[in-house]
Amino acid sequence: RRENRTSESIFGYCTYEGGYFDVKYMTKEYLRQAADQGSEPTRNSFVKSRVLFSSDPEIEELVARIPVFQEKERDEKMLSFYSDLYMSYDYFWKACRPEGYMKIRTASEIVYCIYRLILQENRVLFPCNRRLEETVAGLENKPEGIVELCRQFCEEQTDELAEKIMSLYASWTTYDWTKDPGQFYTQYCRDFEQWWLYPRPLLAEW
């Protein structure tokens, strides 16, 4: 840590062309914290992990606890992601009529929230943004055609497509999205304006 080299890529030893070893050095305390309160990308990074050697009998148990969907966080995450979706669509997209950067940002946030909500309803860990869309596409339980529609929306960014996406998700989900809008606004403020008050990962990586 003193040299800021706890992560590195090692080339030249992998058994397939273009391959490399993605190395991250972790302490036992890191593993314990990841098992107790790790973010979903952290937990997902341990999927299919194996302990090849350890003189510490606790390591294997700690590693096994990490790549597990956290049911206790599900309700709060559903509220947070739906609140973000609600504000992104109803306020930023429909009321603010964004252009340029903000239009791209809002469109991607709408898609991001829908994808994260679908993962939560399936109790599937969020891997990372790079793998998010392919993970959702691989699920059987999802709104029919949602990935194709979201990709089209990201490219064209029209009101008609935004409305179609929202309607498709609303007709599929089992989440109670008919709550008082004030609850969604309150949660949005907590997640985006007051996040520094609470010991929790930012919504984008939670």
Residue ranges and their predicted role:
Residues 1, 6-7:
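Extreme N-terminal leader/anchor segments
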Residues 67-206:
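Conserved nucleotidyltransferase catalytic core and NTase-mimicking acidic/glycine-rich helix/loop elements
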Residues 7-99, 200-205:
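Conserved NTP/Mg2+-binding pocket subregion across the NTase superfamily
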